[in-house]
Each structure stands twice: as C-alpha cells, then as structure tokens.
UniProtKB/Swiss-Prot annotation:
It comes from the Bacteria. InterPro entries: 4-hydroxybenzoyl-CoA_TE, HotDog_dom_sf, YbgC/YbaW. This is Putative acyl-CoA thioesterase YneP. Its EC number is 3.1.2.-. CDD domains: 4HBT. Has acyl-CoA thioesterase activity. One of its GO terms (molecular function) is fatty acyl-CoA hydrolase activity. Keywords: Hydrolase. It comes from Bacillus subtilis (strain 168).
Length: 138
C-alpha cells in the first residue's frame, strides 16, 4: 500500500471564531492529499480532465478527533482504501504537529464523461492508472 504524505501550514483564514481549523477546510486538504497521491503514482488529474473525464465525489465520511490551530503544520496521509476498477475509495488521516490524529476520513469517487456526466469504466478509460491503482491499494 502506498501512502502519500503532504504537509500543509494552517493559515489564519482557515480558522474559525474558536481559533481552530474550520471543519470544511479539511475537505480541501483531503483534495490536496488526493492530488499528491495521484502525482506520486505518476499521473496528473488535469490529464484526465483534458481527455474529457471528471472524477466527482459520490460519498464522503469524516470523523474529527483533535483540532488544528493557526500556525501549526498538518500532515495529510492519503492512500487508496479500496478500488474495483469503477469506484475508488481514498483514505485519509490528517495529523497535528504532535503526531496525533486530527481527522480520519474516506471519499468515494467514480469517473464520468465531462459532457454527459454518465459514468465510465475507469479501468477501460485509463488502463495505466488502473494498473497503478491495483498495485497501490490497501
């Protein structure tokens, strides 16, 4: 299983009135982690889009454990939790500077045609990605 690791410095604008990271910003960081994982595997999401394919989120689950604060550095760990050639489930752990788990999450994605939004078979449309995902998954 390949785990991508990406550091993110918490910016002031990402915090709320309580002085902690606003909950929705973790979703943005998950996307940053997912993009880093794809790059680690030798691909670019933008190349998929150039071929007229999008990969929307179809399900998301997030559990908040410990808050992060302005000025701290978060570390996003991302991996392929499950993959069946059609749907990909990415797993995420985001850690605080003490190495404590801040969030635990998954997001599920499928591929669709950009124009029709009809689902497509990832393994058929991107056989090289398929091979890499099979090797990298949990």
């Amino acid at each position: 299983m390949h785990v991508s690791k990406k550091e993110i410095e918490v910016r002031y604008a990402e915090t709320d009135q309580m002085g902690i990271v606003y909950h929705a910003n973790y979703l943005v960081w998950m996307e940053v982690g997912r993009t880093a994982l794809i790059k680690d595997l030798g691909f670019l999401y933008s190349d998929m889009e150039k071929k007229g394919v999008l990969s929307p989120v179809v399900d998301i689950n997030i559990s908040y454990k410990k808050p992060l604060h302005y000025g701290e550095t978060a570390v996003v760990h991302t991996w392929i939790e499950d993959y069946n050639g059609f749907k990909t489930v990415y797993g995420y752990h985001i850690y605080n500077p003490a190495g404590e788990l801040s969030i635990k999450a998954t997001s599920s994605h499928i591929c669709v045609d950009k124009e029709s939004f009809k689902p497509i078979q990832f393994r058929k449309a991107f056989p090289d990605w398929h091979t890499a995902y099979e090797k990298a998954k949990k």
